[in-house]
A protein has these predicted regions:
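Catalytic loop of the DD-peptidase/beta-lactamase superfamily, centered on the K-T-G motif
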Residues: 2-108
Length: 108
């Protein structure tokens, strides 16, 4: 899904550039009501932060349970999704997730 927000996938693009820019504009900051960490949000999307590392400052997406994550980076033109067979027990900072994201950006 995230790949189709930054470009076409099999001829389909989910949102226009203008809609994407509108959706990822930071609309709120401060402690998240559930996670209690400072996380900037656009319209339904987490933005890159110290707590929710999504690759770069042009990334938008969302973390899920146990270290799963999905995001897009419109400047790097990538979509990324990761789910695992064994969930991490922490609320943030799964080293497997961080290592995969780092490897993607190192390969660009």
């Amino acid at each position: 899904m995230y790949a189709a927000t930054v470009g076409e996938v099999d001829g389909v693009r989910l949102i226009s550039d203008q809609t994407m820019r509108n959706a990822i504009e930071i609309r709120s900051t401060g402690p998240d009501a559930v996670l209690v960490f400072d996380i900037p949000f656009g319209l339904g999307f987490m933005r890159n932060s110290d707590f929710a590392k999504l690759g770069s400052d042009s990334s938008f997406g969302h973390y899920g349970a146990g270290g799963s994550v999905g995001f897009a980076d419109h400047e790097a033109n990538i979509g990324f999704g990761y789910v695992m067979n064994k969930m991490d027990l922490g609320i943030a900072g799964d080293p497997r997730t961080a290592a995969l994201i780092d490897a993607v950006y190192e390969s660009l």
